Amino acid sequence: MATVSMRDMLQAGVHFGHQTRYWNPKMKPFIFGARNKVHIINLEKTVPMANAALAELTKISSRKGKILFVGTKRAASEAVKEYATGCDQFFVNHRWLGGMLTNWKTVRQSIKRLKDLEIQSQDGTFDKLTKKEALMRTRELAKLENSLGGIKDMGGLPDALFVIDADHEHIAIKEANNLGIPVFSIVDTNSDPDGVDFIIPGNDDAIRAIKLYLTAVAAAVREGRSQDLAVQAEESFVEAE
């Protein structure tokens, strides 16, 4: 079972929150105290909450659920793409476009345009265009790939969101709430935990901490997938008998 230990969290600096003056009082239950005007997160709370979230993510992916990883700030962007891709899931790692979930119909049209442009760039269509037109389409393709590349093969709304920074990604969380999509999120001491179904109190800035969360979530997803495959294999074996 995918889990994270207290030791892993301490080594990655998960317990370091933000400066005390930036705190959100709603995070008080998860704060151990303060050191040098920086809040210290209570890992006695974080460890079981993180492991409960991982168990639920395993369950969702064992039912073929789609997990959308969201981390658009610089510290998280590259890692979010790497780990989401590594477990065959989906991601938004640049700007969250308003309506990405709540206006899926429009987003789907943009994804279709992205895929059309990808085909045109490969089948020689671009070569037949004027230099100016080809350049315009190349730029449009790059822009669409940047914003929608991570969800172009999602084929519909996700079954869960895994978010790195609840404060930074509040629009994504609000959209998921409106649609009843469960939200799993790292929530630092400066963030509002409201709207997050599975709160993981922790540092959302340190790259080591971010990679620790992503490694664990990717492992949980892969574990869920392998359970699903094992069930499928068992069912086909029974049918064969």
Curated annotation (Swiss-Prot):
GO terms for biological process: translation. It comes from the Bacteria. Signal peptide: none annotated. The keyword tRNA-binding does not apply. One of its GO terms (cellular component) is cytosolic small ribosomal subunit. Pfam families: Ribosomal_S2. One of its GO terms (molecular function) is structural constituent of ribosome. Keywords: Ribonucleoprotein, Ribosomal protein. HAMAP family: Ribosomal_uS2_B. Belongs to the universal ribosomal protein uS2 family. This is Small ribosomal subunit protein uS2.
